[in-house]
Curated annotation (Swiss-Prot):
Belongs to the variable small protein (Vsp) family. Genes for both Vlp and Vsp families are on (usually) unnamed linear plasmids in B.hermsii HS1. It is a lipid-anchor. Gene3D superfamilies: Lipoprotein, type 6. This is Variable small protein 11. It is found in: Cell outer membrane. It comes from the Bacteria. One of its GO terms (cellular component) is cell outer membrane. The Vlp and Vsp proteins are antigenically distinct proteins, only one vlp or vsp gene is transcriptionally active at any one time. Switching between these genes is a mechanism of host immune response evasion. A lipid is attached at C19 (N-palmitoyl cysteine). Residues 1-18 form the signal peptide. A lipid is attached at C19 (S-diacylglycerol cysteine). Keywords: Cell outer membrane, Lipoprotein, Membrane, Palmitate, Plasmid, Signal.
Length: 205
């Protein structure tokens, strides 16, 4: 995100350097590009700020979802006592707390996605992708709740993998959420790039 902000600042600087070299009289928030295009900098800057904040929030959601994969690596494991900081096999089928931790992550994501769909100024396409991710997240939450009905079952290594290990063939809900969040992040980044491009793109003929 720091690199993106730096790129925005550099682009704004380039626009200012190339603008207002003659042409019609402009309002205080307007600049004229070398091709004659008039930009409302206040409006464009506001759009860039909004879409960048949206993309940053999506990145946080993406990071949370991907962290479930790290939790899955601890199924049936414990920290070694030799201070190496690595994991080793432990008593099998004792995963209820691990699954509960993953459930909390997904519950947090639910709240984040509900907030994102309410953001003003984002495109209908982005809202649709947020809703797709939200629906996929709800599906995974339902799987957690279904698994929790049988506490003895959710403890088992193989049952835990079906919920939170994306390499498991039965973890279809998690894989669906992974795909939806990947697509949402890609679309959010493209929206930021498009907003920045408004500063440099030539006027349409």
């Amino acid at each position: 995100m720091r690199k993106r902000i730096s790129a925005i600042i550099m682009t704004l600087f380039m626009v200012f350097m190339s603008c207002n070299n003659g042409g019609p009289e402009l309002k205080s928030d307007e600049v004229a590009k070398s091709d004659g295009t008039v930009l409302d900098l206040a409006k464009v800057s506001k759009k860039i700020k909004e879409v960048s904040a949206f993309a940053a929030s999506v990145k946080e959601v993406h990071t949370l979802i991907k962290s479930i994969g790290d939790l899955a690596k601890a199924i049936g494991k414990k920290i070694k006592t030799d201070e190496t900081g690595t994991l080793e096999s432990s008593t099998a089928d004792q995963n209820e707390q691990l699954v509960a931790g993953a459930f909390q992550v997904v519950s947090t994501v639910k709240g984040e996605l509900e907030s994102l769909v309410q953001v003003d100024g984002i495109s209908d396409d982005l809202k649709a992708k947020v809703n797709e991710a939200k629906n996929a997240n709800d599906g995974l939450l339902s799987k957690f709740k279904s698994s929790a009905k049988d506490n003895e079952s959710v403890k088992k290594d193989e049952e835990a993998k079906k919920v939170i290990d994306r390499t498991n063939a039965s973890a279809t809900e998690l894989k669906k959420l992974d795909t939806a969040v990947d697509e949402l992040l890609k679309a959010a980044n493209e929206a930021v790039s498009a907003a920045i491009a408004e500063l440099t793109a030539p006027a349409k003929s």
